[in-house]
Amino acid sequence: GTPKGNAAIFDEWHKEGRHWEGVGYDFVIGNGSDSADGEIEPTFRWWQQKVGAHCGGTPGNWANVDGVGICLVGDFNHTYPTSRQMQSLAQLVRFLESRYNIPKGRIYGHNTTPGANGKTDCPGRHFPMFKLKSMLD
């Protein structure tokens, strides 16, 4: 994770540093550093329904093809998400669950996505997945 950034910064970094088409995520949720705390930024991948580049290594690339990539700005090995980030994340996930009939059991962190290559500690040891799931009830 990175303590600063926003969708535009990640877009540039993914283009220049990784030689991707652009930002790999469908949504970026700010932490107050380079966008508002809790601000949900949809990216071109969401607007154009482009295949993501947020979770490699899954069989058939299913997580990028069929999954929705949501990035929270922050390094959650060293800090916790802000309360506004968590509120926005829960709001966004509830919307996606309802709109696309996604069961709560299909909501994963990057490192717990079935079939992912496992070479990441994302979303970080301080990311409260249990809290997110309880916020969805």
Please identify what each model-predicted range represents.
Residues 29-47, 58-137:
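Basic/polar, cationic surfaces and motifs that engage anionic cell-wall
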Residues 1-49:
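Short, conserved "active-site rim" segments that organize catalytic pockets and cofactor/ligand binding
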